[in-house]
Regions:
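Extended catalytic-interface subdomain
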Residues: 1-23, 32-39, 43-46, 70
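Residue-identity detector for glutamine
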Residues: 9, 28, 57-58, 88, ...
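Secondary-structure transition/capping motifs at alpha-helix termini
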Residues: 11-32, 74-81, 119, 169
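Low-complexity, flexible helical/coil segments
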Residues: 14, 121-123, 184-188
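Residue-level signal for alpha-helical context at structural boundaries
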Residues: 20-23, 102, 130-131, 193
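Aromatic/acidic polysaccharide-binding cleft in carbohydrate-active enzymes
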Residues: 31-146
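C-terminal beta-sandwich/jelly-roll accessory domains of carbohydrate-active enzymes
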Residues: 128-131, 144, 154-200
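Short edge beta-strand/loop segments characteristic of extracellular beta-sandwich folds
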Residues: 150-152
Length: 200
């Protein structure tokens, strides 16, 4: 749904720019442009609106999956989306950090952002999907001849086997996984590493 909204808004912006009156006479007008910015995206659960402190929201493994899917949408649409701002970064809604007294807890969303930072400054890498599994979402990018691939398994009950084929055999460098048996698992002051990214 978000991807469709992005495309619709881009079309509306372009149509609006096209409808603006063109300058007359010998003067050249500066090129008209208008960037699309997505603000305050992320999961907003209804319980947060009654929370004290206000809008405090725990982030679960399920939230991490939707964060990864949303970032992949933005990455696929960099030609249309100039900037996207996560709802909040600390203590509120889809945050990366939660505080509890003297504790600062990294949420599963933090790990997603940490894993995805390799795509900064990279180019989207096109690929062909055969026998697509609707529960697996894939995004790839390339930077300085390094290829980065995201695989997001949206199934909470089933592992998936994915085969990647390259025209030339690449050297495998590393893999990171964010996983939890229970999609409702989260990190807190007593269990700060319940849901954390692991090598392999």
């Amino acid at each position: 749904e978000l991807e469709n909204v992005i495309h619709e808004q881009r079309r509306l912006i372009d149509a609006g720019l096209e409808a603006l009156p063109k300058p007359e006479g010998p003067f050249q007008a500066a090129p008209r442009k208008c960037e699309l910015i997505v603000g305050e995206w992320g999961n907003w659960h209804s319980s947060a609106f009654n929370a004290r402190p206000a809008l405090y929201q725990q982030c679960t493994m399920r939230d991490a999956v939707t964060t990864a899917l949303t970032l992949d949408i933005f990455h696929r649409n960099t030609g249309d989306v100039r900037m996207a701002c996560v709802a909040q970064s600390v203590n509120v809604l889809n945050s990366l950090f939660l505080t509890d007294g003297e504790h600062c807890i990294l949420t599963p969303n933090y790990d997603v952002f940490d894993m995805y930072q390799v795509h900064q400054g990279a180019y989207t890498l096109g690929f062909e999907e055969k026998n697509k599994d609707p529960e697996v979402c894939i995004f790839a990018s390339i930077k300085n001849d390094d290829i980065y691939v995201n695989l997001v398994n949206t199934s909470y009950s089933e592992s998936k086997k994915i085969e990647l084929k390259f025209k030339q055999c690449p050297e495998f460098v590393e893999a990171k996984t964010l996983y939890s048996k229970d999609p409702q698992n989260y990190n807190d002051a007593r269990h700060p590493n319940r849901v954390r990214c692991k090598e392999g």
